[in-house]
């Protein structure tokens, strides 16, 4: 029995999230069906992050166990020949039995993209939120976000339906910057609550539009005022960038941040 790790990229626009579910097309189901076709075995996959419907991934990490003669590094090419073009396997490697795509991760990285231009852009429409009504103040947004760093209870930023025992998690870093008309919100954390990033971004946009102050934003999550959370950012602007481990298991690729920066003029 071998454990195989996959570095996976997908456009989540037409998928009901990562996790397999009844009467819906998901990334996990699509990947497992492709694995069945090539191995003739029922394969259970595990991911570093369970992305919601419409959310993308530029460097999702997945693993599965298999008893098969196929070389580990061949799965990427074979799977890419079977999978829809919206799902790509960037690399496949064999890992230790003790390594787990989810539990071995030190932290995960999500990025949210806001198009703050007055004009729509079809070339980034499926991967950004076109919020154009007011020019966002990214400095205010950044100032409001910094107090979230560290371990806190983020109950206010958790959608109903979560199966977690508690809403405590540790945010490693929040970075918000403007690149011309685009606002990039990068959040790194040990774990994320259900709908957490989209709820955070929704409230930060209100801060950037000066509809609420940074102090009100902080009061909402510190005092768990869930009913005061008024807006959730659309799924299409959110991307699971990567998961970070003590040791990089992928041999060919040293940095699995594959976010398409070539679309962003002046990005560095």
Swiss-Prot record:
GO terms for molecular function: RNA binding; tRNA pseudouridine(38-40) synthase activity. The active site is at 52 (nucleophile). It catalyses: uridine(38/39/40) in tRNA = pseudouridine(38/39/40) in tRNA. Substrate binds at residue 110. Pfam families: PseudoU_synth_1. One of its GO terms (biological process) is tRNA pseudouridine synthesis. NCBIfam families: hisT_truA. Formation of pseudouridine at positions 38, 39 and 40 in the anticodon stem and loop of transfer RNAs. Belongs to the tRNA pseudouridine synthase TruA family. This is tRNA pseudouridine synthase A.
């Amino acid at each position: 029995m071998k454990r195989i790790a996959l570095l996976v990229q997908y456009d989540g626009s037409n998928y009901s999230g990562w996790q397999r579910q009844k009467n819906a097309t998901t990334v996990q189901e699509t990947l497992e069906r492709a694995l069945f076709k090539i191995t003739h075995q029922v394969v259970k996959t595990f991911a570093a992050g369970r992305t919601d419907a419409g959310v993308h991934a530029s460097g999702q990490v997945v693993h599965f166990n298999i008893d098969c003669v196929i070389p580990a590094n061949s799965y990427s090419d074979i799977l890419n020949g079977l999978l829809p073009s919206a799902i790509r396997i960037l690399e496949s490697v064999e890992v230790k039995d003790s390594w787990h795509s989810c539990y071995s991760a030190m932290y995960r990285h999500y990025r949210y993209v806001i198009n703050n231009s007055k004009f729509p852009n079809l070339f980034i429409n499926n991967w950004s939120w076109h919020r154009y009504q007011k020019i966002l103040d990214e400095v205010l947004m950044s100032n409001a976000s910094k107090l979230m760093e560290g371990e806190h209870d983020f109950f206010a930023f958790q959608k109903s339906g979560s199966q977690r025992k508690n809403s405590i998690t540790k945010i490693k870093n929040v970075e918000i910057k403007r690149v011309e008309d685009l606002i990039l919100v990068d959040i790194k954390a040990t774990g994320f609550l259900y709908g957490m990033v989209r709820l955070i971004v929704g409230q930060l946009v209100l801060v950037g539009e000066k509809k609420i102050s940074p102090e009100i934003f902080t009061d909402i999550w510190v005092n768990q005022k869930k009913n005061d959370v008024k807006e959730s950012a659309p799924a299409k602007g959110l991307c699971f960038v990567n998961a970070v481990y003590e040791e990089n298991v992928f041999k060919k690729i040293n940095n699995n941040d594959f976010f398409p920066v070539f679309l962003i003029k002046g990005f560095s």
